[in-house]
Amino acid sequence: MKAVILESYVMEGGDLDWSGVKALVPDTTSYVRTAYEEIAPRIGDADIVLLNKCRMDEEILQQCPNLKWVGIIATGTDNLDLEACRRHGVAVANVPGYSTYSVAQMTFSLLLAICQCAERYNRAVKQGCWQLDIPESIGLLPQMELYGKTYGVYGYGSIGRQSARIARAFGMEVLVCTRTVRPEYAADGVEFVDYDTLLRRCDILSLHCPATPQTRGLVNAEALARMKPGAILLNTARGALVDEEAVAAALHSGQLGFYGADAFVTEPLPQESPLRAEPHAILTPHIAWTTREALQNLMDITTRNLRTWLEGNGEHIVNR
């Protein structure tokens, strides 16, 4: 067996390394990063490939006839043509649930940064200001208490559900819009509603679903107009869920109070993005999943996925 790691940077640094994978497949070649045009030549006649953001499509698969297993070092598979992989007899394994707590934590980090104006007040104190003695260059913003607010969750997978638990701990009413309501959700203390109701009633809307043909552009100008004036939108899921131009316009007009995001349509966020100019947009560079604990989970599950496949079973295969 021969393996190729196309994006080793994902799991390097500190005490994280690829030794577990290399112990399973000694003939492993590793590349820090790989551009699209380099993917097929680097895979060559390998049986196994591990990747994160690299694409895997029909064109690449045709050039790699020996490929049998793709391990995506992530949960989402937006960059992979799963049906093409299935046609070519290539199993694809993902890593579900590795960053549930970390991403939910980032969601509330963004929300608390918005509600407490922490970054602005940090600057003020370091400049020698105190309480209401804040210069105009920094600006005094009112803080917001979360208790009693209505928190809307779109998508109720493991991250959405954990986000709802945290919201309830803050004393918020939680509304959920999800495709499937399961019996075990009955004890969660949340109310299940349709999308229109979610938009109209929530003070805070948090997105926790994959980007699919049905959810791309979910939050567009029409949806934003149906939300409460001054509501908060949070996106730690996928950038494609929102129309960023519409979000920037809604921020500029005041219809949307704040936007907190860790995911964007194009990454890195382009210099010309209108979000960069909006003071009420709180943006982080898609790092919610990179806590030390989440990365260790990612490495452990990736290695286990490979081991179980080599043993003839294969965990977390998403294209059977």
Show which residues each predicted segment covers:
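N-terminal glycine-/charge-rich "phosphate-binding" loop or analogous flexible N-terminal tail
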Residues: 1-46, 175
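Short beta->alpha connector loops at strand-helix junctions that form conserved
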Residues: 32, 73-74, 90-101, 178
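An anion/phosphate-binding loop that grips the pyrophosphate of nucleotide cofactors and donors
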Residues: 46, 64, 202
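Rossmann-like adenosine-cofactor binding region
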Residues: 58-61, 179-274
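Phosphate-binding beta-alpha-beta segment of Rossmann-like dinucleotide-binding domains, i.e.
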Residues: 88, 96-150, 184
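Rossmann-like dinucleotide-binding domain for NAD(H)/NADP(H)
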Residues: 92, 230-320
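Glycine-rich Rossmann-fold phosphate-binding loop(s) that bind the pyrophosphate
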Residues: 156-157
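N-terminal Rossmann-fold NAD(P) dinucleotide-binding loop
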Residues: 160-161
